[in-house]
């Protein structure tokens, strides 16, 4: 049988740094108010780079690190809720920029679960035997979706991109995965609505910026994500002691605190970087993974078991246990 493995990781964030104190100068908030509720101290905000620009930086790094030629890449998946445009896809722009002429490319929209969903799909593509090498990138410029007069959401989000190179392997590396969607709760977190605009249609007011029921999302993350992770471990015969690190979507430090207690895994196994990047949606997990590899916490030698778990709009949530 053919399986997939993560062979390279990379990330990139815009240079411009916006601190909580910077935000306090343009809205009614403070560093103490933001940090005590979220664990976020600063975030990177793009000045002139689009989502595709961030993703291209990651793709270039992955190619350089791997030594592969661009025409060896079979597919590119970009997980994003903030594409440059509805058409063409962000992934198509990445494919063109790196001259991956043999690759097919598409975007995936699953909000903050996007990277996990995309990685699960990419694993199946390689397992089919039809493809050998693929890129999975999470990239966001959420700053363009934020209402900068709404302190409840404006303080949360940042821009960035991270990604992995997947290669075919004789050994199984994606050990377990449950993916979930509950569209009945979709109104808890919305952004980028469009309205009918033809002369034959009745239009309605569309909500363009991020709107969130914070309490509902907080409760969802604690309840549903924790339950999913516990079920995942039970069904896969992988115990909490087998997990080396937990890389969860970087939405809120208090969410990580509560999930750690719920699943009874030591808090120190939960890596975090939301204090420096904020919530970067589909980019948060691959950025965290790339930084952990840079720091030597994750070795990419196939000896560690890592829990990846995303959750967000849709509502969507999903987890993978990956040998890496």
From Swiss-Prot:
The keyword Transferase applies. It comes from the Bacteria. The active site is at 112, 249, 279. It is found in: Cytoplasm. It is an enzyme of class 2 (transferase). InterPro entries: ACP_syn_III_C, ACP_syn_III_N, FabH, Thiolase-like. Gene3D superfamilies: 3.40.47.10. It catalyses: malonyl-[ACP] + acetyl-CoA + H(+) = 3-oxobutanoyl-[ACP] + CO2 + CoA. Catalyzes the condensation reaction of fatty acid synthesis by the addition to an acyl acceptor of two carbons from malonyl-ACP. Catalyzes the first condensation reaction which initiates fatty acid synthesis and may therefore play a role in governing the total rate of fatty acid production. Possesses both acetoacetyl-ACP synthase and acetyl transacylase activities. Its substrate specificity determines the biosynthesis of branched-chain and/or straight-chain of fatty acids. This is Beta-ketoacyl-[acyl-carrier-protein] synthase III.
């Amino acid at each position: 049988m053919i399986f997939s493995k993560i062979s390279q990781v990379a990330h990139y964030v815009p240079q411009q740094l916006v601190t909580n104190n910077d935000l306090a100068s343009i809205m009614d908030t403070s560093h103490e108010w933001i940090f005590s509720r979220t664990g976020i101290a600063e975030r990177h905000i793009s000045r002139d780079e689009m989502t595709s620009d961030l993703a291209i930086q990651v793709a270039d790094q992955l190619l350089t690190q791997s030594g592969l030629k661009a025409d060896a890449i079979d597919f590119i998946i970009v997980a994003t809720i903030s594409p440059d445009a509805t058409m063409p896809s962000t992934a198509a722009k990445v494919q063109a920029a790196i001259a991956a002429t043999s690759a097919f490319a598409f975007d995936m929209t699953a909000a903050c679960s996007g990277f996990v969903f995309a990685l699960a799909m990419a694993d199946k593509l390689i397992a089919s035997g039809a493809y050998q090498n693929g890129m999975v990138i999470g990239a966001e410029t959420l700053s363009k979706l934020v209402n900068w007069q709404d302190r409840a959401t404006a303080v949360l989000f940042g821009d960035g991109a991270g990604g992995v190179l997947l290669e075919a392997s004789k050994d199984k590396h994606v050990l377990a995965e449950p993916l979930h969607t509950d569209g009945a709760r979709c109104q808890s977190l919305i952004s980028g609505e469009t309205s009918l605009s033809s002369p034959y249609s009745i239009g309605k007011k569309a909500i363009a910026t991020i709107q969130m029921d914070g309490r509902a999302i907080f409760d969802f993350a604690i309840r549903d994500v924790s339950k999913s992770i516990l079920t995942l471990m039970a069904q896969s015969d992988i115990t909490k002691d087998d997990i080396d690190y937990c890389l969860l979507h970087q939405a809120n430090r208090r969410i990580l605190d509560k999930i750690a207690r719920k699943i009874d895994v030591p808090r120190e196994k939960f890596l975090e970087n939301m204090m420096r990047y904020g919530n970067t949606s589909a980019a948060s997990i691959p950025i965290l993974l790339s930084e952990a590899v840079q720091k030597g916490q994750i070795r990419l030698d196939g000896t560690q078991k890592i829990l990846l778990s995303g959750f967000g709009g849709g509502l969507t949530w999903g987890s993978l246990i990956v040998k890496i």
